[in-house]
Amino acid sequence: RVGLYSKRGRSRIEAARSALRDAGFHGQSDADLRAARTFAMAEPDGSDARKAADELDFYAASGARDFLFHAEEHELSPAELADMTEALGLRVLGLELTHSDAASLYRQRFPDDPAMADLRRWDAIEAEHPDIFRHMCQFWCVSSGV
């Protein structure tokens, strides 16, 4: 099982991070983290900082610190994941879908792929629906030789 953050899916979080950094928050102490969350909640609906409050992790200190002030995070597109799995000789078995519309969107667009395991096709879906892997892109793979 592999889980990675999606570039498109995390764009709203990156915007929130940037807004909080610009406001002077760094999340290095509990007090700074609480102040950053208070600031975000006081911002107008729809603002970049306020969008952080749409995430469940926002409401727990460890989760908020991780998603808002993570020291180093690598984000990839499903197409980049496809390149990586192919280069490593891996075959994708399937994805763990958390977005309620993900499976129906894929099946409507690609009815010939009942396994829904083509990362390049998922990239096309995500291009149209950037929040589909908002939390994480998780998938199962095996060696191509198996």
Predicted regions and their residues:
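Rossmann-like AdoMet/SAM-dependent catalytic core
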Residues: 33-146
